[in-house]
Structures are given as structure tokens and as C-alpha cells.
Amino acid sequence: MSKQKHSASSGRWLKEHFDDKYANEARKKGYRSRAYFKIEEIQTKDKLLKSGMTVVDLGAAPGGWSQYAAKIIGEEGQIIACDLLPMDPIAGVSFLQGDFRDEAVLDALLERIQPSMVDVVMSDMAPNIAGNNSVDQPRAMYLVELALDMCRQVLAPNGSFVVKVFQGEGFDQFVKEVRDMFKVVKIRKPDSSRARSREVFVVATGYKG
């Protein structure tokens, strides 16, 4: 019995230690967060980002996704980022601080974007966790629905969408909605995403407009 307990706790410790390597690596390389590795892995598999693109980054702070995307799209591209929290400046990124759920913030964001001219909408938004799934999951699904609605307003034909989603109530219906709007939809769980987390990333390409 004690051996079994030891084995389970050792397994948890090893998993935490493995997870920490991403945070440590991010600090060592000057990346804004471990999220940098998530979008890097998605890009390696799905090739969403290309030089010269226009990208919207929702839930951007502290800037891991914007930092990576800016490197790929280069000086010819542009990123419009938004978050409730402040974010240190990144070259090539236009940042708007505010609550994306607020109509005034959404309007201010849309003013910076030409309709149907965005190539990729990225969303790493997550709600403040209350610790009660019956509260947390609807909040999380509300945010991903807002991100999908942003696609309807700004995404160019054949554009792409990548969004963090927590598996649970409303997940299957959301994926169905995305499939109705995009030609190809994949579910990704990057190695740098904690195994115990319910987060996955819906990666959609070929916006039908």
C-alpha cells in the first residue's frame, strides 16, 4: 500500500517537474510566458501564421502569443492585441487594455481593424477561476463565443482561428459552431499544456465568410 502511494506521489512530482521546464525555459529565453511554447507547437503543426499577416490576439497579456506571432509575421505584418491586464510593449503590436466583454472596448478594438482584413484571430482568454465548475465553465464558454463572434466581424475569407477552450458543458456545441464556419477544424493539446488541465485548443482554417 505504501509503495503504491509513493508511486502515485512520485508520478505527480515528476509531472509537475516536467511542466515546470516550460516556465523555466520561457524565463531563460526571455519569452513572456509558457504560452509561447503552445502557440509555437500549434504553428509547427498547422502553419497558421505567415509573413505580412494581420493578426488579432485576444487575452494577450503577458504577451507570449503576440511575441511569437510578431517574430513570424515580421515587420510587414501587424498584431492588434487586447487584454484586461497591462502588457509591456512588443514591437509591431498595437495593444489595447480593457475588458473584451465591454461594448466600448470592443468598439475601440474594431476601430483599429479593417473589416474582413484579418488573417488570424487568436484567443487565449480565460475567466478568473472561482473553483466552481458550474460557474467557471459557462464563463469560459462565453469568452470563446465572443472570440468566435470577432471572427464573424473581422476575419478575411479563408482566414484562421485558434482559441483556448476548456472541455466540459458547451464544448461540443461550440466545436460544431466552428465547423459550420470553417473548412478544417482540429483539436490540439500541446505538450506544454498541463496534462491535468481541461484546456485544449481549437484550430480552424479556411473561414467560409
Curated annotation (Swiss-Prot):
Belongs to the class I-like SAM-binding methyltransferase superfamily. RNA methyltransferase RlmE family. Coiled coil: none annotated. It is an enzyme of class 2 (transferase). The lineage of its organism: Bacteria, Pseudomonadati, Pseudomonadota, Gammaproteobacteria, Vibrionales. Its main location: cytoplasm. One of its GO terms (cellular component) is cytoplasm. Pfam families: FtsJ (PF01728). It comes from the Bacteria. Specifically methylates the uridine in position 2552 of 23S rRNA at the 2'-O position of the ribose in the fully assembled 50S ribosomal subunit. This is Ribosomal RNA large subunit methyltransferase E. S-adenosyl-L-methionine binds at G63, W65, D83, D99, D124. It catalyses: uridine(2552) in 23S rRNA + S-adenosyl-L-methionine = 2'-O-methyluridine(2552) in 23S rRNA + S-adenosyl-L-homocysteine + H(+). Keywords: Cytoplasm, Methyltransferase, rRNA processing, S-adenosyl-L-methionine, Transferase. It comes from Vibrio campbellii (strain ATCC BAA-1116). It is found in: Cytoplasm. Its EC number is 2.1.1.166. InterPro entries: RNA_methyltr_RlmE, RNA_MeTrfase_FtsJ_dom, rRNA-MeTfrase_E, SAM-dependent_MTases_sf. NCBIfam families: PRK11188.1 (NF008390). The gene is rlmE.
